[in-house]
């Protein structure tokens, strides 16, 4: 089905995503399956073994036929969009390593998502975002800054304004961060090793000297990074990878709460982590699946005991 050169390039691409881009296993498996499906379709479409010539010659008709096939195979919109992202990623890799250029592939727009999507992102969408956010930045320190900031927001449920106000003084404790939130209300939030390590790496690469009480996240001119600047990076990310329109820095705070709830955390704990005054705010803030609510109801209602 595939000639030897294509097989070798796929192996190199997989190693690149794993070792250099540090993609999660979940994304690696998904992307590999998406590319496999695409190449199998190309083999069927051309009735011939897939070669570099066929890869280079992929046109609008082939791409649209493949996307239509995915839809007929009952792939959901997010999976179709992810598949297109995987193919674009592979072609981007081929541009760098094999000098193969195909502008048609990059011109294909991802399928639009429903306007009624909840504000939280799915775990898959979060994984894609964390894996790809480093691709947006004109220098290495900005790339690692973007990832460190996004991981911190999602790992700790911070508001973008809170994350951008963090200084070296906040980072002295290896297990907790003290945050001054809305209404000058201080809260203590655990932070994960992955966030600590990324911030440490970012500070090592940061080309500007900082005082201990200065915010650590800086713009390219060395000034304090502003929310609109970071959100512009996220806009590039969601457009290229077909992620939901509501994706923003704040949607990762929503996702933090939603995913904790779906994995068994109680609302009171989430309320404390988010810094909400009332529990009702937390309830409306999180995305709770019907299945989760149904399970909680059946398990907890006294009449069922």
From Swiss-Prot:
Q: Where located?
A: Cytoplasm
Keyword Cytoplasm listed:
yes
Active site per the UniProt annotation: 159, 182, 250, 253, 276, 285 (o-(3'-phospho-dna)-tyrosine intermediate)
Q: Which UniProt keywords apply?
A: Cell cycle, Cell division, Chromosome partition, Cytoplasm, DNA integration, DNA recombination, DNA-binding
Q: Name one GO biological process term.
A: chromosome segregation
Q: Which InterPro entries match?
A: CB, DNA_brk_join_enz, Integrase-like_cat_sf, Integrase_catalytic, Integrase_recombinase_N, Integrase_SAM-like_N, Tyrosine_recombinase_XerC/XerD, Tyrosine_recombinase_XerCD
What pairs make up the disulfide bonds?
none
Enumerate the Pfam families for this protein.
Phage_int_SAM_1, Phage_integrase
Q: Could you state one GO cellular component term attached to this entry?
A: cytoplasm
Q: What is its main location?
A: cytoplasm
Listed GO molecular functions? Answer: DNA binding; tyrosine-based site-specific recombinase activity
**Superkingdom:** Bacteria
Indicate the quaternary assembly.
Forms a cyclic heterotetrameric complex composed of two molecules of XerC and two molecules of XerD.
Descriptive protein name:
Tyrosine recombinase XerC
| Species in which this protein is naturally found | Rickettsia bellii (strain OSU 85-389)
| Gene that this polypeptide is encoded by | xerC
């Amino acid at each position: 089905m595939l000639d030897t050169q294509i097989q070798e390039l796929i192996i190199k691409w997989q190693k690149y995503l794993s070792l250099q881009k540090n993609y999660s296993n979940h994304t690696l498996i998904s992307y590999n399956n998406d590319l496999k499906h695409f190449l199998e379709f190309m083999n069927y479409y051309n009735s011939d073994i897939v070669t570099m010539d066929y890869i280079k010659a992929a046109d609008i008709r082939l791409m649209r036929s493949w996307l239509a096939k995915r839809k007929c195979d009952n792939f959901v919109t997010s999976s179709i969009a992810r598949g297109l992202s995987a193919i674009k990623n592979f072609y981007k890799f081929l541009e760098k390593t094999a000098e193969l250029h195909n502008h048609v592939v990059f011109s294909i727009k991802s399928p639009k998502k429903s306007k009624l999507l909840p504000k939280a992102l799915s775990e898959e969408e979060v994984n894609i975002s964390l894996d790809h956010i480093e691709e947006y930045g004109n220098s290495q320190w900005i790339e690692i800054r973007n990832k460190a900031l996004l991981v911190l927001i999602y790992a700790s449920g911070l508001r973008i304004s809170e994350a951008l106000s963090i200084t070296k003084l906040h980072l002295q404790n290896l297990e907790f961060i003290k945050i001054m939130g809305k209404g000058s209300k201080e809260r203590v939030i655990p932070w994960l090793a992955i966030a600590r390590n990324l911030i440490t790496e970012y500070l090592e690469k940061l080309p500007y000297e900082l005082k201990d009480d200065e915010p650590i996240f800086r713009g390219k001119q060395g000034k304090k990074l502003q929310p609109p600047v970071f959100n512009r990076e996220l806009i590039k990310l969601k457009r290229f990878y077909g992620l939901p329109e509501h994706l923003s820095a704040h949607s990762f705070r929503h996702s933090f709460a939603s995913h904790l709830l779906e994995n068994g955390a109680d609302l009171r704990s989430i309320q404390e982590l988010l810094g909400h005054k009332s529990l009702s705010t937390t309830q409306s803030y999180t995305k709770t699946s019907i299945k989760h609510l149904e399970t909680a109801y059946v398990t907890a209602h006294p009449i069922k005991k």
